[in-house]
Amino acid sequence: MDHEADAYRTDLMTITRYVLNEQSRNPEARGDLTILLSHIVLGCKFVASAVNKAGLAKLIGLAGETNVQGEEQKKLDVLSNEVFVKALVSSGRTCVLVSEEDEEATFVDPALRGKYCVCFDPLDGSSNIDCGVSIGTIFGIYMIKDKENVTLEDVLQPGKNMVAAGYCMYGSSCTLVLSTGNGVNGFTLDPSLGEFILTHPDIKIPKKGKIYSVNEGNAKNWDEPTAKFVEKCKFPKDGSSPKSLRYIGSMVADVHRTLLYGGVFLYPADKKSPNGKLRVLYEVFPMSFLMEQAGGQSFTGKERALDLVPTKIHERSPIFLGSFEDVEEIKGLYAAQAK
């Protein structure tokens, strides 16, 4: 790429232009999803600004409340949740919201209701705020059949029903990765323009990667297939080079690297967390949707992740996602154990 020429490019594909182009492909589209996504983008810009100024503005530190997951809430968590709830409700396109920070689902006032449900984690990896490690927002969007009579059952859909999913990573740059079911694209926030610009068009994950990403501190509690897979990563029997371990501890950052470079991200079940640790609706499903759209796979240890039907809004699940061949290898190990 000619960076000098790139610096003077004037024909920039903004995220708004991209979403409008996608909308124009569907003759039946009325623009509701476009409006909803524009409100999510605004929320991401707001949170990106707050994250950048957190230390200076004294937003770092505990807020003195505990969320539904039993984690002490940090000021930025609380702020980010408020920002996204207000942005989503004010769009007039949502009827129910599920946030990682709120114990109950939020049902939108009938006068402001639209046809979408949004499940989101407003600030994933927030324990990393104090040390400047990348953190992010994750979201998944579903269509609701009857917005006038929406119930909790409407929220508990399998991930394959999602119409769009994405995440925004607040790191060395602010990157928003989005799929509306037609591939995956990455946009980077240009602070001078205040716009997300298309920088990673049509992301495709490599078929096989050289990296595995897992918290090896939990190794003593793993099941046999997970332990075998990690052992093969470190000590391959076929004479090939071992895989490199990369683990940040922020799901958005770890999945982002996996998506771009290939490999596999795993957060398996173990004796301490027999149902896994990551939440289905706003962590497992959106990331699995993106991974499949980019040509990868996602697996729970029992089934394709997007086929899972949750029974409660904060349900957890084990997850293995990444390059197609790497996840295929993990599926083979679980199939062998089941025989």
Swiss-Prot record:
One of its GO terms (cellular component) is cytosol. PROSITE patterns: FBPASE. One of its GO terms (molecular function) is fructose 1,6-bisphosphate 1-phosphatase activity. The keyword tRNA processing does not apply. Binds 3 Mg(2+) ions per subunit. It holds the Pfam family FBPase. Mg(2+) 1 binds at E71, E100. Disruption phenotype: Reduced tiller numbers, pale-green leaves, reduced growth rate and dwarf phenotype. One of its GO terms (biological process) is fructose metabolic process. The keyword Cytoplasm applies. It comes from the Eukaryota. Catalyzes the first irreversible reaction from fructose-1,6-bisphosphate to fructose-6-phosphate and inorganic phosphate and plays an important regulatory role in sucrose biosynthesis and metabolism. Required for sucrose supply and tiller bud outgrowth. NCBIfam families: PRK09293.1-1, PRK09293.1-3. Homotetramer. This is Fructose-1,6-bisphosphatase, cytosolic. The gene is CFBP1.
